[in-house]
């Protein structure tokens, strides 16, 4: 059997957020109710500012395969996280697929945050604040908007131009009022849900 190779643009065109939301929700339920293979995360500092991480194995009940993800994080680059996800046959170890993990990682993290907020936030929460106007901030807001009706949103970023672009583009895309705030305090004032999507400390 040949190994399937999926590049980033193919991953982006093939992934459907709503299908992923349903699958991720079920995966969290399965993980909490049934025995699972313990996953490991190994992280190492690279020379300079980068870090390398290996996450393994990724398994879920009913899927006869496991994944190994290898990626590196370079905060000054765009995208900041790059890597590959390898999918192996759980019985033979055969390499079934190699996929660019950049978009997969962003989607999984964004969807997981949105699911958590949907479960934990009060049902009336319809005002959202996003701290960080990068890829993760966009994924968080898009994903939450797919789960809940949002009345309005605000965004703050240490780079004001990035927040302004985020607000303009997400307002148009989602059909809701998204405002760029001048400070984190302004962004979260009155918000029922706050997503922090930044490495800033």
Question: Which residues does each predicted region cover?
Answer:
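N-terminal ligand-binding/catalytic initiation module
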Residues: 1-106, 114, 121-124
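Short helix-loop-beta connector
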Residues: 120-127, 149
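Glycine-rich Rossmann-fold phosphate-binding loop(s) that bind the pyrophosphate
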Residues: 133-134
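N-terminal Rossmann-fold NAD(P) dinucleotide-binding loop
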Residues: 137-138
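Aromatic pocket-lining residues of Rossmann-like dinucleotide-binding sites
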Residues: 144
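NAD(P)-binding Rossmann-fold cofactor-contacting core
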Residues: 147-173
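Rossmann-like adenosine-cofactor binding region
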Residues: 175-201
């Amino acid at each position: 059997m040949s190994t399937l190779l999926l590049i980033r643009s193919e991953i982006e065109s093939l992934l459907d957020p709503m299908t992923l939301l349903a699958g991720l929700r079920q995966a969290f339920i399965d993980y909490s109710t049934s025995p699972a293979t313990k996953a490991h995360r190994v992280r190492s500092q690279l020379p300079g500012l980068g870090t390398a991480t290996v996450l393994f194995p990724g398994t879920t009940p009913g899927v006869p395969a496991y994944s190994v993800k290898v990626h590196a994080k370079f905060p000054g680059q765009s995208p900041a996280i790059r890597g590959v996800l390898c999918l192996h046959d759980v019985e033979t170890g055969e390499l079934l697929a190699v996929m660019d993990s950049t978009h997969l990682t962003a989607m999984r993290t964004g969807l997981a945050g949105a699911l958590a907020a949907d479960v934990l936030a009060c049902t009336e929460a319809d005002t959202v604040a996003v701290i960080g106007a990068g890829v993760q901030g966009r994924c968080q807001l898009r994903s939450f908007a797919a789960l809940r009706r949002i009345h309005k949103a605000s965004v703050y970023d240490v780079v004001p131009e990035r927040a302004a672009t985020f607000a303009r583009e997400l307002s148009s895309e989602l059909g809701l009022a998204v405002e760029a705030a001048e400070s984190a305090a302004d962004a979260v004032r009155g918000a029922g849900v706050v997503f922090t999507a930044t490495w800033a400390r």
